[in-house]
């Protein structure tokens, strides 16, 4: 199952060695897939490729999609049908992506198809607004193929993008903020972020409610 999941994350059909993204793929996407490990470092496995091919036949006979097909199949469909892709680019004038640090390659490819950088790729019928939110230091879905390098290269993909840094914590205790900051600085992205604590404490629930009301007012 993990072999099939990995192949689908990289948009690989049975027998494929590189992503089949079609003529509508953003420039350099196939090269990026190779950089990220596509084809997988351990290479195709003939016996598993046969199982994968049989699995796809059974899905087709059942008129079914599995979970990974919901994204990978959409990418293949849009890449193969430029008119359909253009219609969805017109339909979605603004796109919001939460937890961007946890997207995988197939999800990234879908975002790039629907919201290409029209300044670079000379496309004017596409999403005018793309807003993503995420933190590379909170990436937790690597076991499902996510790669925080996608959020780290966002400014490369969209060089005109504005960046808003959220540097206040409203829920963590001071000790947690301090410990997390030391860990991130020592071992992760080294982004140099300093998180400020913005957290009020109240003696009772009633006083907390009053404090919230005053803040809103």
Summary of predicted features, one role per range:
Residues 8-11, 55, 81, 118, ...:
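Conserved NTP-handling cores and scaffolds of large molecular machines
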Residues 159-162, 167-217:
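Helicase P-loop NTPase motor core
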Residues 4, 66, 133, 176, ...:
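A residue-level signal for conserved active-site and pocket-lining positions in enzyme catalytic cores
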Residues 3, 83, 159:
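Conserved N-terminal phosphate-binding loop of PLP-dependent enzymes in the Aspartate aminotransferase
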Residues 37-153, 165-172:
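Conserved helicase NTPase motor core
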Residues 1-59:
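Coupling/switch/interface segments within P-loop NTPase motor domains and analogous charged loops
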């Amino acid at each position: 199952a993990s072999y099939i999941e990995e192949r689908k994350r990289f948009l690989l059909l049975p027998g494929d060695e590189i992503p089949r993204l079609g003529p509508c793929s953003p420039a350099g996407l196939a090269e990026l897939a190779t950089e990220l490990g596509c084809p997988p470092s351990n290479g195709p496995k003939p016996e598993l490729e046969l199982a994968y091919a049989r699995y796809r036949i059974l899905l087709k006979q059942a008129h079914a999609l599995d979970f990974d097909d919901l994204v990978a199949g959409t990418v293949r469909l849009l890449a193969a049908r430029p008119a359909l892709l253009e219609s969805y680019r017109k339909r979605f004038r603004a796109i919001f992506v939460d937890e961007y640090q946890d997207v995988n390659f197939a999800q990234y490819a879908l975002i790039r198809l629907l919201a290409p950088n029209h300044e670079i790729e000379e496309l004017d019928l596409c999403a005018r607004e793309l807003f993503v939110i995420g933190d590379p230091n909170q990436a937790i879905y690597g076991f499902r193929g996510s790669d925080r390098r996608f959020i780290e290269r966002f400014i490369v993909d969209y060089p005109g993008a504005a960046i808003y840094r959220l540097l206040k914590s409203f829920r963590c205790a001071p000790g947690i903020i301090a410990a997390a900051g030391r860990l991130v600085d020592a071992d992760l992205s080294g982004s140099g972020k300093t998180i400020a604590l913005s957290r009020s404490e109240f003696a009772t629930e009633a006083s907390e409610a009053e404090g919230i009301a005053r803040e809103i007012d």
